[in-house]
């Protein structure tokens, strides 16, 4: 079935219009020179003529003196050297002399021979032993050269100025092209086309956007019943989940032009440039309809008006936002121009931008679950030779919390490791080594003392042992005392499945296991070190959220005390105002301390009771440096881990 929409001749785009009326454009490339431009040139030349003698006086550093003063100093044998050029004499005194009208004594001078001449001057100079230099009179060529030196820069600057004006008039974008849109246009060709098959792990988001694709392919299907497609679709989600890729897939599936621009590219230092770029972008899109406009990082221009405390760029950003609001609500939706935008800060967007008629549909792109991660890995390993025995579902299960960008990086790192090792395919070892490198950091060749190695071994053994003994704690997959990243040792714990709810018992187990390293140091050595800094940061964050967000403190009660609207996909905003009293803040601090102290006491108690297991695990770490989960269980005597019932 032939679609009438596709048979309609497309309006000429920028490429086809570029070579129209070529001869005419070449003949009138400079265009008419405005009358004010000639006034500017005349004023510039006059200023140059008046200022040049002041900036570049003849005889640099010389003072003009009367001829009689020169003759007097010559008689006093105070003239050291002179240079003559026609009737002009420049020279230098042996000793500086006081000249009427000049505050400072004069050493270099300039004077002129009277019109009636002085026949005795040369003999007097020779008699006094004055060094005489002669310069020829200026020729016609040197005069022209002097004129070019004086007026040439001004003329060149004026010609450059006229060229800029002509370019600005021909492009109709203002001087220097500041108002021109910087949107990049992508035409869906077979070599660069992105489809929904290239996007995996976010099936719900793809289903939401399938209607947009259907509208671009079959607009009459909706228009015949009076329906209109949403003018704006806002993609919301954490960084790396595939929002930009999803937008390009929509354009690839629909087979229409795709204009992409970052929100930060609209705003410039000059007020009004952002609004001009918005207008130009939408004008260009209307000529290419049906098409898609994609604005990445919308929060750069879409922040709530009046909420910024910054002075610089504040008015410019608001003008750009106002123009965007007008354009989205000012053009006919039946023209087939759809605006997609992506952000991970939906809480800061202006309400007028989210109202029906603008960005009235919101698609949340969440982190993929285990099945989604498996599909993403299958997409990214299409062109990667894999070990036939490799099970990608095992890799997907070991990567909870990773998004599409992380998994793509994981596949690339695994392929690089396999190539470095001279393999012909990528196997399980390469994937897990790459995962450790990404999550834990690269191994460092760091020489540490035996005492520090022993402390690190007990510190990591405390983490690992409590991770095995505590109920609901995340499984321990690996422990090492090889320095990685900024840590001297690492205990790698990840949940077996994706978690969406946390019990209080689970959270306390996480705090207790995180404090196991500090507790082991105090128990074995009697002193503590700075090695638990990151552990203390983690447990403080968990305990405070238990008190302020999740209602797990009886004294504080069932209240939510974090500032409203200050958390998003990037985490809490540090610039917030506290919305509770000082007395309640004291209670929150006390309850946070209480939870941490109770968990630390439990960690000390468990490690003291299991001291033999702790010593065995630490000694094994000192020998092997790295232990996997099965080795840890055998050393502490817990036996092989039993699989969970299906």
UniProtKB/Swiss-Prot annotation:
Sequence ranges on the Cytoplasmic membrane side: 1-35, 166-646
Q: Which residues hold ATP? A: 237-244
Which membrane topology describes this protein?
Multi-pass membrane protein
| Membrane topology (Extracellular) | 57-144
Location comes to: Cell membrane
Tell me its EC number(s), please. 3.4.24.-
Q: Which cofactor does it need?
A: Zn(2+)
InterPro entries in UniProt: AAA+_ATPase (IPR003593), AAA_lid_3 (IPR041569), ATPase_AAA_core (IPR003959), ATPase_AAA_CS (IPR003960), FtsH (IPR005936), P-loop_NTPase (IPR027417), Pept_M41_FtsH_extracell (IPR011546), Peptidase_M41 (IPR000642)
Q: Where is the active site?
A: 460
What CDD domains is this protein classified in?
Answer: RecA-like_FtsH
Top-level class of the enzyme under EC nomenclature? hydrolase
Biological-process GO terms, alphabetical: protein catabolic process; proteolysis
Q: Does the keyword ATP-binding apply?
A: yes
Cite the cofactor comment.
Answer: Binds 1 zinc ion per subunit.
Q: Which Pfam families match?
A: AAA, AAA_lid_3, FtsH_ext, Peptidase_M41
Q: What does this protein do?
A: Acts as a processive, ATP-dependent zinc metallopeptidase for both cytoplasmic and membrane proteins. Plays a role in the quality control of integral membrane proteins.
Q: What is this protein called?
A: ATP-dependent zinc metalloprotease FtsH
Origin species, per record, is: Thermobaculum terrenum (strain ATCC BAA-798 / CCMEE 7001 / YNP1)
User: Quick one: which gene encodes this?
Assistant: ftsH
